[in-house]
């Protein structure tokens, strides 16, 4: 009937609004983006809450992620299945956390997951080495990498255990004025 959307029920849209930083228009825009990634897989009608997983290989081709050296890690951090495949809910969560309105604490939680390559709930020297390799496209020599990693741990490791727990990480990014402006993507 007319221009009334039939992708989601009103209750679904209300629920998305309640648990994200988006309005109804944003949710519909996100669905359109999700649909564009895999039109043969993603239904236009979500009123019966279908569970559809779009593969990471398609998600990382989005313009917002394509050039990001952490694109796979970002997608994995939001993937319920742990393989990087995203449901629509995962996709909305990713955009919600990475939107400008999301609070620093929420962004910090996901940033920590992204940099914790070995998923041991710490950012250790090996995690920092992998981070540096991605940021510098492996252009630093081994001595430079060791120096940078040692310096980061020396300055950010508040409890002296040789690795960064979440509290150490949160304290470190609180001192980074550009964290909020760089840890986001737009719809």
Curated annotation (Swiss-Prot):
Question: Which InterPro entries does the record associate with it?
Answer: CIBP (IPR051433), EF-hand-dom_pair (IPR011992), EF_Hand_1_Ca_BS (IPR018247), EF_hand_dom (IPR002048)
The record's Gene3D superfamilies line, in alphabetical order, gives: EF-hand (1.10.238.10)
GO process terms (BP) = calcium ion homeostasis; cellular response to ATP; photoreceptor cell maintenance; positive regulation of cytosolic calcium ion concentration
What subcellular compartments does it reside in?
A: Cytoplasm; Cell projection, Stereocilium; Photoreceptor inner segment; Cell projection, Cilium, Photoreceptor outer segment
Query: What domain of life?
Result: Eukaryota
Q: A Pfam family in this protein? A: EF-hand_7
GO cellular component annotations of the record: cell periphery; cuticular plate; cytoplasm; cytosol; muscle tendon junction; neuromuscular junction; photoreceptor inner segment; photoreceptor outer segment
Binding-site residues, Ca(2+) 1: 116, 118, 120, 127
Q: Which CDD domains match?
A: EFh
Q: Which UniProt keywords apply?
A: Calcium, Cell membrane, Cell projection, Cytoplasm, Magnesium, Membrane, Metal-binding, Repeat
User: Which sites bind Ca(2+) 2?
Assistant: 157, 159, 161, 163, 168
Q: Which GO terms describe its molecular function?
A: calcium ion binding; integrin binding; magnesium ion binding; protein homodimerization activity; protein-containing complex binding
- Domain annotation EF-hand: ranges: 66-101, 103-138, 144-179
**SUPFAM superfamilies per UniProt:** EF-hand
- Which PANTHER family is this protein grouped with? CALCIUM AND INTEGRIN BINDING FAMILY MEMBER 2, CALCIUM AND INTEGRIN-BINDING FAMILY MEMBER 2
Q: What else is known?
A: The binding of either calcium or magnesium significantly increases the structural stability of the protein in comparison to apo-CIB (calcium- and magnesium-free form).
Q: What does this protein do?
A: Calcium- and integrin-binding protein that plays a role in intracellular calcium homeostasis. Acts as an auxiliary subunit of the sensory mechanoelectrical transduction (MET) channel in hair cells. Essential for mechanoelectrical transduction (MET) currents in auditory hair cells and thereby required for hearing. Regulates the function of hair cell mechanotransduction by controlling the distribution of transmembrane channel-like proteins TMC1 and TMC2, and by regulating the function of the MET channels in hair cells.
What subunit structure does UniProt give? Monomer. Homodimer. Interacts with WHRN and MYO7A. Interacts with ITGA2B (via C-terminus cytoplasmic tail region); the interactions are stabilized/increased in a calcium and magnesium-dependent manner. Interacts with ITGA7 (via C-terminus cytoplasmic tail region); the interactions are stabilized/increased in a calcium and magnesium-dependent manner. Interacts with TMC1. Interacts with TMC2.
| Name of protein | Calcium and integrin-binding family member 2
Q: Which organism is it from?
A: Rattus norvegicus
Identify the gene encoding this protein. Answer: Cib2
């Amino acid at each position: 009937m007319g221009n009334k959307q039939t992708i989601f029920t009103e209750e679904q849209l209300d629920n998305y609004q309640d648990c994200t930083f988006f309005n109804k228009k944003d949710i519909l825009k996100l669905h359109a983006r999700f649909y564009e990634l895999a039109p043969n897989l993603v239904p236009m009608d979500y009123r019966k809450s279908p569970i559809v997983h779009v593969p990471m290989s398609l998600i990382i081709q989005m313009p917002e992620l394509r050039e990001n050296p952490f694109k796979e890690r970002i997608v994995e951090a939001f993937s319920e299945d742990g393989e990087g495949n995203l449901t629509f809910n995962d996709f909305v969560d990713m955009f919600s956390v990475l939107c400008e309105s999301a609070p620093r604490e929420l962004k910090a939680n996901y940033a920590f997951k992204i940099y914790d390559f070995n998923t041991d709930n710490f950012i250790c020297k090996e995690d920092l080495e992998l981070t540096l390799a991605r940021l510098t496209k492996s252009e630093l020599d081994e001595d430079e990498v060791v120096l940078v990693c040692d310096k980061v741990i020396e300055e950010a490791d508040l409890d002296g255990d040789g690795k960064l727990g979440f509290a150490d990480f949160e304290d470190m990014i609180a001192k980074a004025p550009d964290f909020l402006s760089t840890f986001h993507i737009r719809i």
